């Protein structure tokens, strides 16, 4: 729920600052100036022009996610349903490398799918019947979903007896919004 000291730029925390030295963590002491923050500040212009292309891309993702947290009531106020217990030892879902859950507010259902692996994954996500009952989701063979991170549309099924198939790039995720 918080961004810490350059995280939005991919800060590595590999400077040799403070008492702990080069340990992969950013110091908590205010006498240090973090490289990515300095480059984002760009001499007081705060325009990020000195950041690398990868850092700018990551910053854009963080901006989008934080904006969604304020715009989407399903995120800020909605009901939560964890899907991990229904996907342990899944044939096309690795609970050690992927994470998924649902959020719902009114007629808006959000399916979050995150892939922490470096390779793309074609996932089969089980949504148990309890989720349909608890969140009052109508079962349908085909829903139109919009990925809130990219704006791309895709068709998905939401059925308790058939896995929902989702493709996710490596080190990436999707927030699929479905209007019920």
PLM regions and their residue ranges:
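Hydrophobic beta-strand residues in large extracellular and virion-surface proteins
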Residues: 111, 125, 145, 166-168, ...
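Residue-level detector of conserved, well-ordered beta-strand and adjacent loop positions
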Residues: 102, 146, 177-179
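Loop/helix patches that line or flank the sugar-binding groove of alpha-linked glycan CAZymes
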Residues: 1-143
